[in-house]
Amino acid sequence: ELPGVLGELDYPADLLWAGRSLHHLGDQRAALAAFAGRLAPGGTLAIMEGGLPSRFLPRDLGFGRPGLEARLDALEAEWFARMRAELPGSVGEVEDWPTLLSGAGLTHARTRSFLLDLPAPASDRARAYVAGTLARVREVHGDELDAEDRATLDRLLDADDKASVHHRPDVFVLAAHSVHTAVRTG
């Protein structure tokens, strides 16, 4: 678990990778500085943070109010802001990762976003991923949803319902993940 585990690793490191983890640390700038301090000269820090919300469904499902995923995104954004604010040692930070990496004494090398595009009809594996993701959203945000959106989400998750993500022919996975790299010079 970060940041304590950093002391248990062998240093200096030629490569450190942090995937979707820094946003769970109260002081992201301090965490990046700790990573930078453990890199060998010429070593690279790669972080996966940012990107775009994933999409799985058409805007209009044929039941419920159109735009469910946009409303779920808004709930997720509110949850994320609360989660960040409640972290021990939380420091508000503009999530400009190249600038944060430079501020940690690293030279920003590159940012690249990777697109995951699994068009409809989705494979069983993709459907399982979609169902798992929506089930997590239902568990975390179920009480915040209005009755219609909760019923829509429940129907999408009901494997016995032909309109669920387990059976719909229009389920897809579209996601973008950003990776930022920086190098320790000197």
Would you name each region that the model predicts?
Residues 18-21:
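A short beta-strand submotif of the Rossmann-like class I SAM-dependent methyltransferase core
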Residues 12, 41, 105-107:
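Short loop/turn motifs at secondary-structure junctions
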Residues 90-96, 100-186:
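Conserved Class I S-adenosyl-L-methionine
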Residues 5-16:
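A short acidic, Gly/Pro-enriched loop at the edge of an enzyme's catalytic core
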Residues 47-122:
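Conserved catalytic/acceptor-binding region of the Class I
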Residues 1-3:
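Conserved acidic residues
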Residues 29-44:
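A short glycine-rich, Lys/Arg-flanked "PGG" loop and its adjoining helix->strand segment in the class I
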Residues 23-25:
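A short His-aromatic
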